[in-house]
Regions:
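Conserved N-terminal segment of class I S-adenosyl-L-methionine
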Residues: 1-104, 110-112, 124-127, 142, ...
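Short, hinge-like loop/turn segments at secondary-structure boundaries
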Residues: 89-92, 157-161, 214
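Conserved catalytic loop of SAM-dependent methyltransferase domains
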Residues: 181, 186-223
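Acceptor-substrate binding/catalytic loop of class I
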Residues: 163-179
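Short glycine-dipeptide loop
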Residues: 134-139
């Protein structure tokens, strides 16, 4: 058996040690300038929530541009939550992959999630809660690494793994513009519209070149930002989609207990041991 040697990192290297990685400004990946530009273009922001608020950088942008907005920070642990008390009006520690958001139905004007969704499996539940919490006309602004960035396309062409989606990393979901919109279309159809799509960071170029390149070619950028607007009442489409599509993964669907109605295993199924409740039930196993 041939032994495969350890692959050396390329572009997105460990600790930024690769010479090409040193050229880039890692702060560009979070696109604070993109967040500011998109938030500046919104009006009537009364309730704003940030999922995975981290250091509170993006909430600080909202506070500066919309000083009267009520800011809600949601974090998974107490490490960041303590510091967020100075940045947000309310701070909650919650598991966004399992818990309901601390928002009433149709309460939020804007929900943000920057460099968060790629860390999650339960994407259907998260979007279910976001769309439940947004008012009609409210916006969801999220930034995610782009699996179709220019440097990732090059890496894939030579048989290397995309830097943002390695098995030995914290990222569990890849995103691209086309696939993200296909996901939204499948789950809510005409219930949303994409109002803005932007790029940030352009590997392996320094910031002075990265920004204009990301602006001109966002689908090739390292990070992609979506600003979507909720255009209709939400009917639970995200939570029920895994069952309707018969996805054979035990996705969490909260208290949406109607999921199993969509599952009708064929009578001649060769796998008589299939437990549809285990696959689709709303309760954890």
């Amino acid at each position: 058996m041939d032994r495969i040697g350890q692959a050396k990192p390329l572009f997105g290297s460990r600790g930024g040690s690769h010479p090409l990685a040193r050229l880039t400004d890692q702060r560009e990946s979070y696109g604070p300038h993109v967040v500011e530009e998109l938030v500046r273009g919104l009006s009537g922001l009364h309730v704003v929530a940030d999922l995975g608020a981290g250091s509170g950088r993006d909430l600080g942008i909202v506070r500066r541009l919309h000083p009267l907005a009520r800011l809600i920070a949601v974090e998974s642990g107490t490490e960041y939550a303590k510091g967020l008390a100075q940045k947000a009006d309310e701070v909650y520690v919650a598991n966004i992959e399992r818990d309901a958001l601390p928002l009433e139905d149709g309460q939020a004007d804007l929900i943000m999630a920057n460099q968060v969704l790629e860390h999650t499996k339960e994407i259907f539940w998260i979007f279910h809660e976001v769309f439940r919490s947004l008012k009609v006309g409210g916006h969801f602004l999220f930034g995610v690494p782009n699996v179709c960035s220019l440097h990732n396309r090059f890496l894939m062409a030579i048989g290397r793994q995309p830097t943002q989606h390695k098995l030995c990393s914290a990222h569990v979901r890849p995103f691209s513009r086309k696939d993200t919109l296909a996901f939204l279309n499948a789950c809510v159809g005409d219930g949303y519209e994409l109002t803005e799509f932007r790029g940030a960071q352009f590997y392996p170029f320094p910031a002075r070149l990265s920004r204009p390149l990301a602006n001109a070619l966002p689908t090739f950028a390292f990070t992609i930002f979506f600003l979507i607007r909720k255009t209709a009442d939400y009917d639970g489409g995200f939570a029920t989609y895994p069952a309707r599509a018969r996805l054979e993964t035990n996705f969490w669907s909260g208290n949406v207990a109607t999921c199993s109605q969509y599952w009708d295993p064929p009578a001649n199924s060769s796998n008589n041991s299939v437990d549809r409740d285990h696959i689709l039930h709303s309760e954890p196993r």
